[in-house]
Amino acid sequence: MKYSIQFYEDNQGMLMINVPDEIFLVIDLLLSDIQEDRSKLWLDLIDKVLSKQSSYEELTGNACTLEIKYDVTKIVNEYAEEDQKAYCLIETAELKQILLMWDDAVRNKYTE
């Protein structure tokens, strides 16, 4: 894994994640759109692109839109303020790994 990712529980017991600044919108994607429902829908589209069944897929959730291409996925914050960066780029395969790790963290939290 290229990025250093840390999962933890906040003081209210909510599952949280720390990621490097260059992929900061992964936090919004996980906490606003995917939450604790797991990421199957998102992973299905990523897999469709990575398997070259499709060259491009797009999915919009509560806060973020994913623009998925084979090499790179653009995560766009639909509600970014004017003074905020509205998007970040992440390698599609890396995003897939983070989503799988999130699903594992959710599963572990609720099967304890």
Where are these regions (language model features)?
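Short acidic DE-rich linear segments
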Residues: 107-112
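Amphipathic protein-protein interaction modules
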Residues: 45-100
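Extended charged/polar low-complexity repeat regions
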Residues: 102-105
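Negatively charged, low-complexity tracts enriched in Asp/Glu with abundant Ser/Thr
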Residues: 1-56
